[in-house]
Amino acid sequence: MPVQGSQRRLLGSLNSTPTATPRLGLAANQTGARCLEVSIPDGLFLSLGLVSLVENVLVVVAIARNRNLHSPMYCFICCLALSDLLVSGSNMLETAVILLLEAGALAARAAAVQQLDNVIDVITYSSMLSSLCFLGAIAVDRYISIFYALRYHSIVTLRRAWRVVAAIWVASVLFSTLFIAYCNHAAVLLCLVVFFLAMLVLMAVLYVHMLARACQHAQGIAQLHKRQRPAHQGVGLKGAATLTILLGIFFLCWGPFFLHLTLVVLCPQHPTCSCIFKNFNLFLTLIICNAIIDPLIYAFRSQELRRTLKKVLLCSW
């Protein structure tokens, strides 16, 4: 990863020897001060990546097998699963190669390792960017389906959805390539941070507006049936809880990584920031956790998808 704190892990593994590190401990930063460092065991990292990989493969297979799921909404969900799959797979590949290099089971020249590192970085960052974009696309799709229900099928067509998908993938690959090439430029890192904040604000505004519409709808039904206010309050509380969980998971899983990028620009040499940089692998692990949670939030809640997945699993046996 071309970000301070990762220190080109593949290249560094060529001349390194494996050392046992505690999962949670105190480490000395550049000034000798003590700071908290969370070390993620390789076995745990690979296990989380494998869980994410299996989950998202199942989502992609289920959507591909069922023609009823070939709609714009499921198109975005499928692409989100594919992005999360690539995030997990690329990080697992990098970790596996590092372990093989450190164990001496894999011999490679520095130039070859450099090229492999660049390829993995492009895949990782492009899939991260596309994952964020598809989360935003899903929010926009749901917003249109609620506020423009009668015109939804004319606004959000499958052809337009595929154009959006193609644009997201092309933009993600191009920007990630630029990011790898100019990772030491503050402007590039700040663009990534601004992009994350823009996605966070977009999702928050759209989902809050949808929650307000749901509360108004519930209030109208309650008045129609002459119910009391608590029924409306129950809908509001349930919706608020769902919204808090959705945005909270998004912020907690992605926020630390983009905080890392922000601090790389603002205080690359400060002792406190140096302590945070030491937890870069923890921030990557949180993104892997988000890739595990995404199918639970956006895919597996669909009864149609669950039925298809059940059929696929039964047929495989």
From Swiss-Prot:
The gene is MC1R. The chain crosses the membrane at residues 38-63, 73-93, 119-140, 164-183, 192-211, 241-266, 280-300. This is Melanocyte-stimulating hormone receptor. GO terms for molecular function: melanocyte-stimulating hormone receptor activity. Receptor for MSH (alpha, beta and gamma) and ACTH. The activity of this receptor is mediated by G proteins which activate adenylate cyclase. Mediates melanogenesis, the production of eumelanin (black/brown) and phaeomelanin (red/yellow), via regulation of cAMP signaling in melanocytes. Interacts with MGRN1, but does not undergo MGRN1-mediated ubiquitination; this interaction competes with GNAS-binding and thus inhibits agonist-induced cAMP production. Interacts with OPN3; the interaction results in a decrease in MC1R-mediated cAMP signaling and ultimately a decrease in melanin production in melanocytes. One of its GO terms (cellular component) is plasma membrane. Residues 64-72, 141-163, 212-240, 301-317 are cytoplasmic. Pfam families: 7tm_1. PANTHER family: G-PROTEIN COUPLED RECEPTOR. Belongs to the G-protein coupled receptor 1 family. InterPro entries: GPCR_Rhodpsn, GPCR_Rhodpsn_7TM, Melcrt_ACTH_rcpt, MSH_rcpt.
